[in-house]
Amino acid sequence: MHDHITNTGGKCPVMHGALTTSSMATNMEWWPKALNLDILHQHDHKTNPMGANFNYQDAVKTLDVDALKRDLHALMTDSQDWWPADWGHYGGLMIRMTWHAAGTYRIADGRGGAGTGNQRFAPINSWPDNTNLDKARRLLWPLKKKYGNKLSWADLIAYAGTIAYESMGLKTFGFAFGREDIWHPEKDIYWGSEKEWLAPSDNPHSRYSGERDLENPLAAVMMGLIYVNPEGVDGNPDPLKTAHDIRITFSRMAMNDEETVALTAGGHTVGKCHGNGDATLLGPEPEAADLDDQGLGWLNKTQRGIGRNTVTSGIEGAWTTYPTQWDNGYFRLLLNYDWELKKSPAGAWQWEPINIKEEDKPVDVEDPSIRLSPIMTDADMAMKMDPDYRQISERFYQDPAYFAETFARAWFKLTHRDMGPKSRYIGPDVPQEDLLWQDPIPAGKTDYDPQAVKDKIAASGLSVSEMVCTAWDSARTFRGSDKRGGANGARIRLAPQKDWAGNEPARLAKVLPVLEAIATESGASVADVIVLAGNVGIEQAAQAAGVEITVPFAPGRGDATAEMTDVEGFAVLEPLHDGYRNWLQKDYVVSPEELMLDRTQLMGLTAPEMTVLVGGMRVLGTNYGGTKHGVLTDREGALTNDFFVNLTDMKYTWKPAGKNLYEIGDRHTGEVKWTATRVDLVFGCNSILRAYAEVYAQDDSNEKFIQDFVAAWTKVMNADRFDLA
């Protein structure tokens, strides 16, 4: 029965036909400029072991939070031989784990943060800055195992650091559960272009340009770091230069100077750095470790490598006299002593105090009869040397209660920044106070007649384009990364959104007063009326194409006020491009189609949804400024599949006519029929997108096109309706 098997040259006849590792060239390596549509198809049921019916938000509501809290408190002082706790307390380790999970967040695109449990996966689990955090997660495994599906890794990682602070005496601000785990690394997050860990700023693939301009949206200063280099810029100590890096990095995490000092000091009030050994003896990081290391990395298999002999950052020592308790010792030592540069046993730069009193020295992690010098990193010295940071540090030193409260609030912000609105918070310790950075929205109304509102809108004289564009612009700000933006709140009528160039303020000045008047008359929120107007426009466009439809609608959006809106905080949501409306504010290094892909991923759309939405928006005449690029139809304003029919028709040719401009002409006469942009033509050029375009161009697909367009449109309008989930 095996006679048909031929000689395979010693290779397995089955396995070597599959791309089972990354050692073989992929399509992206063969064609590196191809669109990476995989970023639109992540975290679905094929990778999620929980099944389609599992709802984490429901499951975590059944969690016994008090029992978990008791277990975490007990864990902090239950030292394990395989990874002993410093001074018998794991608090510093757990806090660093939580810090480094939450600290990947960046405000520019909302990506990163503690909300997904991504610290379990590459590349984050193997970054140099996360050395030995694999041990922290293994220490937590018994609790994750015990509480099972009621407790996500993401919530546990965030909660462990919070309880660690509580166990050491800090009154925390609160905590919310509700972070749902992902099951594979994110494919969409850009961490930088460097090809080596900790590449210096003069690296050929550096994230820096000019004097020291950090590439957007990055916040970390080096590949593999969470924040700044603790030894100094490119490893060269200079507290004032480090202060510059700190200010940029923390501002890109949505933190001001006071929050920055509080977080730096509060993070270093407890725990220690580890560099008492030879860093070259550490084994590879988890992703490169041997099979029998079972996911653990940085193992020292030639020396003891644990306890007082642990090597992590290479810096060695504690910041404070009592590293297992919350106090004001950080500022007391930093401000009252002079400090000098020294090298750690591992060869890292660190600052040590001159002529320190014996009683101010922390004790050894294993032997309390031994006292050792405390240390400061270059980042700590920046809190003393930078004038603005120094002023804040002095205030915190003089007012420990104010420092503790400021830190507790900043820690809460750090660990919850990517969770979205407060309505997503779950658990008994959710703070009652509404915070401006949470983008609060009042409760909406449902006690009105949506059909009566639609009738008023239809009679208002607004055009299909005006209604659809206004609804789209209101909703397109949504970011699935940190759950910000969206149509709920109707902030398109407030600063800064009403003045954004991409929202065409002149059009808004005409349309919004009409819709606001209808909202007042009907008792509906303006947010609901804006969405209803878009729905009316689509229904009218479908009717013009000979199809009667009703676009689904769910009332209940609220209207935010100016007092509820952080103008500066919302500035990062401003669209500088929108492929769906065929608009670029200016020319960018990144191609228009890549920008559209990035926006699509943030909005939570799939590649087929992106395709059908672009095709529909074009024929509805929703281009920015009324341009006709990509409007491949003679029936503008009617919801037809003409965009796809004409894009795939071989009777036309496509020729460049300028930067990001093409002419579509008759193949035989040469007569120019339409113009288009790269964003239009990519749906005929990219093999995957063309496959979707061909589906919608088929003779039997107009009804499917309309159904799919309406479904995708409704998804965008409801993206921030967490109450509907």
Curated annotation (Swiss-Prot):
Q: Name one GO molecular function term.
A: metal ion binding
**Protein name per Swiss-Prot or TrEMBL:** Catalase-peroxidase
Q: Which GO terms describe its cellular component?
A: cytosol
What binding partners and quaternary form does the record give? Homodimer or homotetramer.
Active site per the UniProt annotation: 100 (proton acceptor)
Family membership, please give it: Belongs to the peroxidase family. Peroxidase/catalase subfamily.
Give the reaction(s) catalysed: H2O2 + AH2 = A + 2 H2O; 2 H2O2 = O2 + 2 H2O
**Encoding gene, per UniProt annotation:** katG
